[in-house]
Amino acid sequence: MMRQGGVMVGARKRWITDWWPNRLNLKILRQNLQNPYGEDYDYVEEVENLDIDAVIRDLKELMRSSQDWWPADFGHYGPLFIRLAWHSAGSYRIFDGRGGARDGSIRFPPRINWPDNINLDKAIRLLWPIKKKYGRKLSWADLIILAGTVAMEDMGVKLFGFALGREDIFEPDESPDWGPEEEMLTAKRGEKEELERPFAATEMGLIYVNPEGPGGNPDPLGSAQEIRVAFRRMGMNDEETVALIAGGHAFGKCHGAGPADYLGPDPSSSPIEMQGLGWKYNYGKGKGSDTFTSGLEVTWSPTPTKFGINYLRILFTYEWELEKSPAGKNQWVAKDAPEIIPDAHDPNKKHRPRMLTADLALRFDPEFSKIARRFLENPEEFEKAFAIAWYKLTHRDMGPKDCYIGKYVPEETFVWQDPLPRRDYELVDEKDVEELKRRILASGLSLSQLVYFAWASASTYRNSDRRGGANGARIRLKPMSVWEVNHPEELKKVIAAYEKIQQEFNEGAKGSEKRISIADLIVLGGIAAVEEAARRAGFSVKVPFIPGRVDAQQEHVDEEFYRVIEPFADGFRNYFRYPERINERDVYTTPEYFLVDKANLLTLTVPEMVVLIGGMRALGANYSHSDYGVLTERPGVLSNDFFVNLLDMSVEWRAADDYRYTFEGYDRKSGELRWRATRVDLILGHHDELRAVAEVYGCDDAKEKFVKDFAAVCAKVMHLDRFDLWRSNRKLYKEITAGLR
């Protein structure tokens, strides 16, 4: 380390997280807040004016125009673009809806640097002329998926459909937990069925599984088990899994022309003159026939730029023996087979058929094999299954079909799109809304019940894949109706009360087409409770409410999905199922970590999260009706008492259980027990940044601000999933979901 001109040279700046790595990180509540296109930029409006057919023509021309700086395998970039699209979409996992293709985050670390994504930086650069031409009208996120989809069509796949509507982010998304490992291609996340949540990939830096087999062991049956778990965790069943693998491996090849020792660093670690490209391969030409990606050298089909059943035919025709690739990786070669596989760059060369361990899994696993053989015998069924599975893979994080844009959106709707019935009645007006609020408040339901179940319905929304939310009132249907956190028996009584109000209103609207849904009533109940609690605090507040939600039926519910996403933590309701797992030396095991995680899924900022906690506690909207965090003598009054008492230095807090999940607050002078709270409550007074916001709401002059802010954030959460508005009245949707921004 040297000092030059008063400046320390060679010293690395230390960030707060370097010094205090276990400090609760709130960064994910303030990422991607700015768009370089400006505040008025609306991608939906832009992409609706895109000439998609012109883009498709340009893509097809590009795919057949091999570039010297990165030559196309078999003279066609289609397989490379399919891999790019697949790896963009394929990082999606069902547990939290993160990953996937909807925001173009494959362009950023860590995903662009994963070993499984080697040379996809080249694929993105090849697409730059298209992006440059269409600019603000075409996002990278849409272009990447469109390129892979057009490639399939150009190589013979009869597509099922395609939708535009994916909006780019402009910085890395740091919300996903990709795993605890410190090195790429290692695993500390459990195995097979014991793979920890929320992970789907088996190793750090992979999309799914190690293609050599579990941990590099060439075991086809073991690979099948890992494949099944990984694909299920991204929402795919066995048939979809086989279709995707068999269809995807109809195209292109793997690359392992030489030793891995010659491979340069990833894009983020490469020198500045590389301009964001990485993986420079200093072996032979370093491209074309001398390319390294996975280290495996496999071309699956004799027709690698034409869709068909040749992959399956080859897989089941030959017997296979283990060999090493030129890079020393485990792969399989067909015994006594002729050289029928074309070379990617030399038309005069042929190769014997080869497969990956992950390919042999489709042959030797009994269930996979049964499906694969059926596809082999029924090519048309296979093509349709693959087209639908590809559509699902590339669209399942986009949300309901209201979010789909463009002329190629198919008519058919699937349960994974959270479908809803069409509304066939007139909406209530403002006068009706006020009357319904009056009836709800007179129904015998408490304010805490009204808020609790409105939150229970709406807060299932997650912006990661735009699923869940209050529209549809799925809370009254299985499996949400039996979630532990939703108080199943109490929920039945609450729904019954709403059904009575609904029936009386709808029957009383004779001569009119006006109707009210249970979904609207649940939200309206929460809003009525907030307004009444504000009135009790001495303030008049009007919480925005836009009717138009409809009621889903059981056939509209993706039951497997909603079983998987049952929450084990909801800090807003002071619910945490696993206090025994808390380790204070590991923030990722704590309920406060999961509070921030849920706040991110709800698109909340730090102040929005803080004010919501304070309001929910003031209203007593706690799991099991507990008094944890209800730091007020007047629950049901929308006061800032929670913050006042949390910040009160006359109270001393002590752990109340061995897990250090619950705490008791004692008067420092008298020793009298005054309050009880959880870690979620106390973190707002302990964490410096959260305390800074809590102090804003704990001031004497903050009572009205607290009420107004809580009302605004409640309105935001209750309307996040209103994609009917998102499409039909974007200005209104943006206003009502603006929260405190």
Swiss-Prot record:
Description of pH dependence: Optimum pH is 4.5 for the peroxidase reaction.
Cellular component, GO annotation: cytosol
Active-site annotation: 87
Cofactor: heme b
Oligomer and partners: Homodimer or homotetramer.
Role description: Bifunctional enzyme with both catalase and broad-spectrum peroxidase activity. Also displays NADH oxidase, INH lyase and isonicotinoyl-NAD synthase activities.
Cross-link Tryptophyl-tyrosyl-methioninium (Trp-Tyr) (with M-234) placement: 86-208
Cofactor: record remark: Binds 1 heme b (iron(II)-protoporphyrin IX) group per dimer.
Enzyme Commission number, as recorded: 1.11.1.21
Keywords: Heme, Hydrogen peroxide, Iron, Metal-binding, Oxidoreductase, Peroxidase
Keyword Heme: yes
GO molecular function: catalase activity; heme binding; metal ion binding
Site (Transition state stabilizer): 83
Family label: Belongs to the peroxidase family. Peroxidase/catalase subfamily.
Organism whose genome encodes this protein: Archaeoglobus fulgidus (strain ATCC 49558 / DSM 4304 / JCM 9628 / NBRC 100126 / VC-16)
CDD domains given in the database record: catalase_peroxidase_1 (cd00649), catalase_peroxidase_2 (cd08200)
Gene designation: katG
The reaction(s) this protein catalyses: H2O2 + AH2 = A + 2 H2O; 2 H2O2 = O2 + 2 H2O
InterPro entries given in the database record: Catalase_peroxidase (IPR000763), Haem_peroxidase (IPR002016), Haem_peroxidase_sf (IPR010255), Peroxidases_AS (IPR019794), Peroxidases_heam-ligand_BS (IPR019793)
Main EC class the enzyme belongs to: oxidoreductase
One Pfam entry name: peroxidase
PTM (free text): Formation of the three residue Trp-Tyr-Met cross-link is important for the catalase, but not the peroxidase activity of the enzyme.
Name of the protein in question: Catalase-peroxidase
